[in-house]
């Protein structure tokens, strides 16, 4: 089932679809941190930065609903849950790398101006 925000964006243009899927708080940082492979919730939270467990959970659920992230629950005691990029999610790697480079360039230019 497609989320309402994505359905609405589909009526506008592809850029709006990308923003609807990836524009949430911390979503691109989550994707960036899953590029290296599967990760458990706690570790992902530490890698992402100052994000609350509630927000991280919500963003992971939306990314899962949009087919970008998969969630695997292992039948172990204690339970183990891992998140990883789906095949579709992996297609974001070049875009995320480009945005990461752009962000670093932008940040250095702001620093130079101050």
Short names for language-model regions:
Residues 28-29, 42, 58, 72, ...:
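Basic, gly/Ser/Thr/Pro-rich low-complexity segments located predominantly at protein N termini
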Residues 27, 39, 65-68, 101-104, ...:
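Generic structural signal for secondary-structure transition and capping sites
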Residues 5, 60, 83-85:
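Intrinsic disorder/low-complexity segments enriched in polar/small residues
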Residues 1-3, 10, 14, 32, ...:
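Amphipathic alpha-helical dimerization/coiled-coil segments
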Residues 56, 60-66:
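Basic amphipathic alpha-helical segments that dock to polyanions
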Residues 6-55, 76-77, 82, 90, ...:
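N-terminal helix-turn-helix DNA-binding core of bacterial DNA-binding proteins
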Residues 64-84:
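Beta-hairpin "wing" of winged helix-turn-helix
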């Amino acid at each position: 089932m497609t989320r309402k925000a994505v359905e609405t964006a589909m009526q506008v243009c592809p850029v709006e679809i990308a923003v609807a899927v990836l524009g949430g708080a911390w979503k691109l940082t989550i994707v960036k941190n899953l590029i290296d492979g599967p990760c458990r919730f706690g570790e992902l939270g530490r890698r992402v930065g100052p994000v609350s467990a509630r927000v991280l959970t919500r963003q992971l659920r939306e990314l899962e609903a949009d087919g970008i992230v998969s969630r695997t629950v292992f039948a172990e005691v204690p339970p183990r849950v891992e998140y990883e990029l789906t095949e579709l999610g992996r297609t974001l790697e070049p875009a995320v790398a480009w945005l990461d480079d752009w962000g670093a360039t932008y940040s250095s230019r702001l620093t130079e101006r101050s």
